[in-house]
């Protein structure tokens, strides 16, 4: 048994001790606000056949923790004792057992030892939510994903293109990939020493080392690792002393065949106020661009998150989110979480109308208003039919199908009700609109060409 493992020879105090460590790790990792919201009222109940049973105060908190944090909690328990195979979260006390509430300090812990989130060979905290398994791959990020995976799977060797330089806008997945590399190495090659750190934190630690006359220790720390990952390297632009130290750290690691992974919001050639010699070295290896998300990728990300969270979301809501929240993945996931949380707290069903109301401020700030008239004009032009055909009752396929598509897009891209949309299409009733939307949704299941056509129309309308 590892020296970090806590022997669980009975089902009493030792299990309670493990829960206290896990609770502290959760507090330290997620912070006071999130801890108090979700974990502070969770109690240890008992253990049974290598299963730890915890009690949440409400069904909502139980379900939320199960969907978002269950794997994190299990991994933390297993760090302290790998005999624990599963956790169960209930909302009732088990008769004859004693609840154990872990009281935590109001300040963040500064020194928690033996944490699964901060092991001796992984410096700086890795976010357990970000793994390769839950990274959704699409055309905009497939090169970056493949390269990150190759780095992680190199098993002690150095990826042939060193450093790996990932760049792209905010919230597109660069940080996710860096955490995924760290977690993969930690799980499969635990003897390898990995540092993941933001460039800002790198600078602050360097300044602190200068102030405390501990520069030698700083150099030893960063130049003795197997993998160094620095996030948001653009932060050191214009900071000459930090650039000098980074330059020498970079050279030492590359010369010793150690892996480097760097992320940035722009390509190396576009960095300003940074030394040319650093700019040149950042481009030595593989430079992978993480592009803005496509509609298909956003759809995949939403479906993956919904599956992880084990919730049911109507198709029209998913399509609406994928078409409307286009800036970045972080905002997309935030919008989904907001919709789900609103439903859980208010006990209102998740519908397209409710979603549009919940996100109206976000949508207003994101893009211009699209009207039903805009959609009718663009679709008519795209399919080379008369605008008047949108209001007619003609059933010829070459007219009826574009009209159905326009109704579908009106439901997805505008806040109008079915009845209001029907009025815009020659005073048709809401059942006609509903039938059109359902027909298009059924076709989208298998018709790739139609899916691409609708994606193109969305881009035309949104731009």
Swiss-Prot record:
List, in alphabetical order, the Gene Ontology terms for molecular function in this entry: ATP binding; ATP hydrolysis activity; DNA replication origin binding; lipid binding
Residues that bind ATP: 171, 173-175
One GO BP annotation is: regulation of DNA replication
Start and end residues of each stretch annotated as Domain IV, binds dsDNA: 344-463
Where is the stretch described as Domain I, interacts with DnaA modulators? 1-84
Where is the region Domain III, AAA+ region?
125-343
Give the UniProt entry's GO cellular component terms.
Answer: cytoplasm; plasma membrane
List keywords of the entry alphabetically: ATP-binding, Cytoplasm, DNA replication, DNA-binding, Lipid-binding, Nucleotide-binding
Where it sits in the cell: the answer is: Cytoplasm
Task: Kindly list the residue ranges recorded as spanning the membrane.
Answer: none
Cited InterPro entries: AAA+_ATPase (IPR003593), Chromosome_initiator_DnaA (IPR001957), Chromosome_initiator_DnaA-like (IPR020591), Chromosome_initiator_DnaA_CS (IPR018312), DnaA_C (IPR013159), DnaA_dom (IPR013317), DnaA_N_dom (IPR024633), DnaA_N_sf (IPR038454)
Where does it primarily localize?
cytoplasm
Q: Where is this region: Domain II?
A: 84-124
The family database entries (NCBIfam families) matched by this protein are listed as:
DnaA (TIGR00362)
What this chain does, per the entry, is described as: Plays an essential role in the initiation and regulation of chromosomal replication. ATP-DnaA binds to the origin of replication (oriC) to initiate formation of the DNA replication initiation complex once per cell cycle. Binds the DnaA box (a 9 base pair repeat at the origin) and separates the double-stranded (ds)DNA. Forms a right-handed helical filament on oriC DNA; dsDNA binds to the exterior of the filament while single-stranded (ss)DNA is stabiized in the filament's interior.
Tell me, how does this one assemble? Oligomerizes as a right-handed, spiral filament on DNA at oriC.
By its UniProt entry, which PANTHER family does this protein fall under?
CHROMOSOMAL REPLICATION INITIATOR PROTEIN DNAA
* Family per record: Belongs to the DnaA family.
User: What is written about domains in the entry's comments?
Assistant: Domain I is involved in oligomerization and binding regulators, domain II is flexibile and of varying length in different bacteria, domain III forms the AAA+ region, while domain IV binds dsDNA.
Q: What is this protein called?
A: Chromosomal replication initiator protein DnaA
**Protein's organism:** Rickettsia typhi (strain ATCC VR-144 / Wilmington)
Organism classification: Bacteria, Pseudomonadati, Pseudomonadota, Alphaproteobacteria, Rickettsiales
């Amino acid at each position: 048994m590892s020296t970090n493992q806590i022997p669980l020879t009975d089902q009493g105090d030792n299990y309670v001790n493990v829960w206290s460590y896990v609770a502290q790790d959760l507090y330290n990792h997620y912070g006071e606000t999130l801890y108090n919201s979700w974990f502070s009222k969770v109690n240890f109940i008992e253990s049974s056949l290598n299963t730890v049973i915890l009690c949440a105060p409400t069904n909502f908190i139980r379900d939320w923790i199960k969907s978002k944090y269950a794997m994190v909690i299990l991994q933390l328990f297993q760090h302290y004792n790998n005999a624990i195979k599963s956790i169960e979260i209930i909302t009732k006390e088990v008769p004859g057992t004693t609840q154990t509430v872990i009281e935590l300090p109001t300040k963040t812990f500064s020194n928690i030892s033996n944490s699964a989130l901060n092991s001796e060979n992984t410096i700086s905290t890795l976010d357990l939510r970000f793994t390769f398994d839950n990274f959704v791959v699409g055309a905009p990020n497939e090169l970056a994903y493949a390269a990150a995976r190759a780095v992680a799977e190199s098993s002690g060797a150095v990826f042939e293109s060193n450093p790996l330089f990932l760049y792209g806008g905010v919230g597109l997945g660069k940080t996710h990939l860096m955490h995924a590399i760290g977690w993969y190495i930690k799980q499969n090659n635990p003897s390898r020493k990995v540092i993941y750190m933001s460039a800002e934190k790198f600078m602050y630690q360097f300044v602190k080392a200068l102030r405390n006359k501990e520069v030698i220790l700083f150099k030893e720390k960063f130049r003795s690792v197997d993998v160094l990952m620095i996030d948001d390297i653009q932060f050191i632009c214009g900071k000459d002393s930090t650039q000098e130290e980074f330059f020498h750290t970079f050279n030492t690691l590359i010369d010793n065949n150690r892996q480097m992974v760097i992320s940035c919001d722009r390509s190396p050639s576009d960095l300003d106020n940074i030394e040319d010699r650093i700019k040149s070295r950042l481009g030595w290896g593989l430079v992978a661009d993480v592009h803005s998300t496509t509609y298909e990728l956003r759809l995949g990300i939403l479906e993956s998150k919904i599956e992880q969270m084990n919730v049911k979301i109507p198709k029209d809501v998913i399509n609406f989110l994928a078409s409307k929240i286009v800036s970045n993945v972080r905002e997309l996931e935030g919008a989904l979480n907001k919709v789900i949380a609103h439903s859980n707290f208010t006990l209102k069903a998740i519908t397209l109308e409710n979603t549009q109301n919940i996100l109206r401020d976000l949508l207003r700030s994101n893009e211009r208003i699209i009207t039903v008239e805009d959609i009718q004009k663009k679709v008519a032009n795209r399919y080379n039919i008369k605008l008047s055909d949108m209001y007619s009752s003609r059933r010829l396929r070459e007219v009826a199908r574009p009209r159905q598509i326009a109704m579908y897009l009106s439901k997805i891209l505008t806040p109008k009700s079915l009845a209001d949309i029907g009025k815009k299409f020659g005073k048709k009733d809401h059942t006609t609109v509903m039938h059109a939307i359902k027909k298009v949704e059924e076709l989208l299941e298998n018709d790739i060409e139609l899916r691409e056509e609708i994606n193109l129309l969305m881009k035309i309308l949104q731009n």
